[in-house]
Amino acid sequence: MTRVFLIAGEASGDALGAALMTGLKALSPEVRFSGIAGPLMQAEGMTSLFPMDDLSVMGLAEIVPKYPHLRRRLHETVRAVLDRAPDVLVTIDSPDFCLRVAKLVRAANPAIRTVHYVAPSVWAWRPGRAAKMAPFIDQVLALLPFEPPYMEAAGMRCDFVGHPVVAQPQASAAEAAAFRAATLGGMDGPLILVLPGSRKGEVSRLASVFGAAMGRVVARHPGARAVLPAAPAVPGLVRDLVAGWPVPVDVLDPTGLPGPDVAARKRAAFRAADVALAASGTVSLELAAAGTPMVVGYRMAWLTMQIMRRMALVDTVTLVNLVSETRVVPELLGADCEPEALADALDRTLADPGPQLAAERLTMERLGLNGEPPGLRAARAVLDGLAQI
């Protein structure tokens, strides 16, 4: 019997953990789970040590007042791992919490194998993080195909297991066509997806510049229509901010709708759109999976931007550009993220989407599309690592 202690600290980690559990049960039916789980992992049969939401804090303003509670949860988790003495501890993303747990567990019981799921982006900045985690992490499960060499160079085993985006369902052509017809209402289009982010800070920074860019696009394309799927945490803020836009926008508000309906509508919007104006982040991979070309824009505090520019090791932040080894997705960051430049980039993309569509297809192939599901690949890697001990 294989005993696995899993730790997820946020919704994305819960999804990865649930898929990993499914894979482990398929490959090793006698597997037993314990740890910290969200609703998806609990649905796979795990009882959470405490609510995963206790760990879901972001930003200094949230962390400082909750630090004593987080510290208690940290030591409670370490004690639980040591008491259960699992064959393997799998920490999933959330490095600030998870890597502290792994470090303390390794110091107290070196016999417990440690696996971290989601490699830190050392290829982009702070490369020293790999060497710092190597003394207490035996194996890393990577989502991106170019990540293993960075982890292996620091002395850890690293397996590329595929990105979860390749396993996400996509809207059918009929669903996309129905959404497009309902949204455009007989106009010629184009249909433009506006994605200013999922967090209050980034939405507040990007909404005005994205709105001004849309004003310019609609002036050039009178039949254009903007659609904005609001993230669950910010629908009210989004509505307040877009009220001042120079053009109308259809805000897809998830409030009060069942989760499956929200997800289905979002998938239809992604596939139906001619182009997207998006904040930087993993949303670029969701757009690539839907086959929608994009322009990426992002603003942050001036000091943060200067620090990032000096520390960055790559010349692009867009994952489609990185995975496809192209630079076909336009990205306008910091002071370059201004309305006229965004509108011009959207125009160019609408006029010639072909290079982006080719890069998106290549990206999905390299991330594992049409291969073994990422959760099963991750499970196989974990079990293989145990077998090598």
Say what each PLM segment does:
Residues 1-389:
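Nucleotide-activated sugar donor-binding and catalytic core shared by glycosyltransferases
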